[in-house]
Amino acid sequence: QTCCGSKVFCC
């Protein structure tokens, strides 16, 4: 699981 963007959501 990798957090994307500003680490608010993970993809």
Swiss-Prot record:
Q: Where in the cell is it found?
A: Secreted
What does UniProt note about where in the body, tissue by tissue, this protein is expressed? Expressed by the venom duct.
Entry keyword DNA damage: no
Q: Which residues carry this modification: Cysteine amide?
A: C11
Q: What is its main location?
A: secreted
Q: GO MF terms on file?
A: toxin activity
In what way is this protein post-translationally modified? Contains 2 disulfide bonds that can be either 'C1-C3, C2-C4' or 'C1-C4, C2-C3', since these disulfide connectivities have been observed for conotoxins with cysteine framework V (for examples, see AC P0DQQ7 and AC P81755).
List GO terms (cellular component aspect).
extracellular region
Which keywords appear in this protein's UniProt record, sorted alphabetically? Answer: Amidation, Disulfide bond, Secreted, Toxin
- Domain of life from the UniProt record: Eukaryota
Domain notes per entry? The cysteine framework is V (CC-CC).
Q: Which family does it belong to?
A: Belongs to the conotoxin T superfamily.
Write the protein's name.
Answer: Conotoxin tx5g
Species, as recorded? Conus textile
